[in-house]
Amino acid sequence: MSNFDQSIKTLKILSADVKSIIESSAKVIQEVALCLNLNGKPLTNIACAGNYFDELAIGFLKSERIIASLDEIEKIEVEAEKNSVNIILKNKKKSSEIFVKNIASSGAHGKSVNTDLLLPLKVPVDFNIKAQVALELMEELLEKSLLHNETHGTHCSALVQQGKIVALREDIGRHNTIDMLGGYAIMQGKDLSEAIIITTGRISSEIVYKVWNLGIPAIISHSAP
């Protein structure tokens, strides 16, 4: 779940230029540490803005290849007031074999990226993106980046299907926005074989890894590669 108002805090600040220093206020995005538990045991902590905990957790487990589908999950327990999510797998033995380092840098990949572990990705032969559509989608993404427009402190990504934005997520970390969209798609049972991710963030190798393993064939970024 998302709570726009609770994600933004207004703080007193000092604004300085070459002539003066004045007291004013600024809207800033909150930062919380999400505790992700697997079968009741701590798995990792993810720095985030405090929204869509269930999607973020499921998307992260997918990108780490801890799960392949929603069918592997028995129960999702979210305690928003404690910034905690507990994912209970049907295979209880699996959690004892897993170690993921803490993610202080907002959802970055928990392991070093090994291209040998990338899942097969088949791009439809007739898959294409028209330049004008790409530009229009990016313009829409920027217009709908409400948290960024208020605070200038978030990244924003969106899932596009059939030329339309079907889901949009903002967070302090660009990695988190991808995991949220991945979690959303998994929970909604979306076919991502012809989907597109558009994002305001730089496309690092970790972003490519996450998008690739979701089965999404294309990324469009507003930033440098």
Language-model segment annotations:
Residues M1-Q161, A167:
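Intrinsically disordered, low-complexity regions enriched in acidic/Ser/Thr/Pro/Gln residues
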Residues K144-K190, I196:
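Histidine/lysine/aspartate-rich catalytic loop segments that bind and position anionic ligands
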Residues R174-P225:
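Feature captures the catalytic cores and cofactor-binding loops of soluble hydro-lyases/lyases
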